[in-house]
Amino acid sequence: MKAHEILDSFHSLLEDVRRGLFITIDSEGYPQARWMVAASLNEQPDYIYSVSFDSSNKIRDLATNNKVAWSFQLPSLNEIVYIQGEASVLDNPQLKAEVIEALGPNLAHFWRVRPEHGQLVVIETAIEKIRLQQPLANANSAGKL
């Protein structure tokens, strides 16, 4: 399977699950994982978008190391996508509006759990490596973008 085919499979999976495990490296060099709502934008298929507050730990992590990983899976575990890339923290009002619209009602839990005040920012992950694992079919595919 070619990289663009894996990316197509990922976009289909993301439409279904809308959430992924986002992994950063903290200032002490340890991985930090947290579940996040994520989306892609049609005009930027090689990127993953999410939002956070500028005061969050993940934003501090990205300030010292922008290398990240994502993991997405179907509840049945018959498709799992692993992504590696570089993340940027962006404070662009137009992009923020597009991302919030793409994330839509999936942010309801985010607003309840994170009532803190702060500036909402976009986390944009440029996908560099992608791997699709299909355990039930005993299949693995990987590609670089």
Which residues does each predicted region cover?
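A short, Trp-centered hydrophobic/proline-enriched beta-strand micro-motif
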Residues: 12-27, 68-72
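Short, positively charged
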Residues: 1-5, 60-61
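A short mixed-secondary-structure module that forms the rim of ligand-binding clefts
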Residues: 39-77
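Hydrophobic/aromatic beta-strand elements that line small-molecule binding cavities or substrate pockets
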Residues: 36-40, 85-87
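Short, surface-exposed beta-edge/turn micro-motifs
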Residues: 17-19, 46-48, 65-68, 117-120, ...
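Onset of an N-terminal alpha helix
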Residues: 3-11, 15
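Charged, gly/pro-rich active-site loop segments
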Residues: 2, 82-145
